[in-house]
Structures are given as structure tokens and as C-alpha cells.
A protein has these predicted regions:
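Structural micro-motif
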Residues: 81-91
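N-terminal leader/targeting and pre-domain segments
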Residues: 13-35, 108-119
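Non-catalytic, surface beta->alpha helical segment in thiol-disulfide oxidoreductase systems
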Residues: 91-119
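Local sequence-structure signature of Cys/Sec-based thiol-disulfide redox active-site neighborhoods
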Residues: 24-56
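Thiol-based oxidoreductase modules, predominantly thioredoxin-like and allied folds used
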Residues: 19-20, 39, 51-76
Length: 119
């Protein structure tokens, strides 16, 4: 039973947490009401630390689309939130940029997510 539950959670997380595979972040933002983007890089240790925390938030907030964007692979996407440090988390609502923070602290990320849902 525990294994099946874990698989279901992974499937749900997969639907809620998207890995950017092409430079289409602008389209994702336009098509979804609320979006939280984690800008990261493979070499970024703090980015790797935050990824499971982002997955946790994705499971808890099914009204929000969470996206992980490799900032080196998709440099144009960085311009949407003026990203200059990693990890950076940016929020968008109804296609508009709301806010961004550069953090490796879960509480700060949670506050950012709450801000987009309450705005």
C-alpha cells in the first residue's frame, strides 16, 4: 500500500511540477492562472536542496503550476524575472510577473507561494 501511495504522489507531483524542456516558459505562464518558477542549474547545490521542497509545495497547492527552469539551458527565461542568482523563485499570476526571491529557505518560499495565492 505504501508503495502505491508513493507512486500516486509521484504522478500527481509530475503533473504539478514541470521541468522546462524547451524555451516555452512564456507560454506556460500565459496558459496557467498561477505559476511558481524555480530557476536553477545542475551545479547549484542550493537548487538541489530546494527541489524536494518545491515538490512538497506542488502537492499541497494544486491550483498552482510549479516549473523548474534550468537557467543556463534557457537564458531567455531568466529575463522574465530578472534572475541573477540561483536559486531564484518567481511568481506569475494571470500572465503577469508578481514577485521573485533568491533563497534556499523553505519558509521564504512558502511566503512567496502564499503571496501569489492571496493576491
Amino acid at each position: 500500500m505504501r508503495l502505491l501511495h508513493s507512486v500516486r504522489n509521484d504522478e500527481k507531483t509530475k503533473n504539478m511540477l514541470q521541468e522546462l524542456e524547451k524555451d516555452n516558459l512564456q507560454d506556460i505562464i500565459a496558459k496557467n492562472n498561477m505559476v511558481v518558477v524555480q530557476f536553477s542549474a545542475t551545479w547549484c547545490g542550493n537548487c538541489r536542496i530546494m527541489k524536494p521542497k518545491v515538490k512538497k509545495l506542488a502537492l499541497e497547492n494544486d491550483a498552482i503550476t510549479f516549473v523548474v527552469a534550468d537557467a543556463e539551458k534557457f537564458p531567455e527565461s531568466r529575463k522574465l524575472a530578472t534572475v541573477d542568482n540561483l536559486p531564484t523563485f518567481a511568481t506569475f499570476k494571470n500572465g503577469n510577473f508578481i514577485n521573485q526571491v533568491q533563497t534556499n529557505k523553505f519558509d521564504v518560499l512558502k511566503d512567496l507561494v502564499n503571496e501569489v495565492t492571496n493576491n
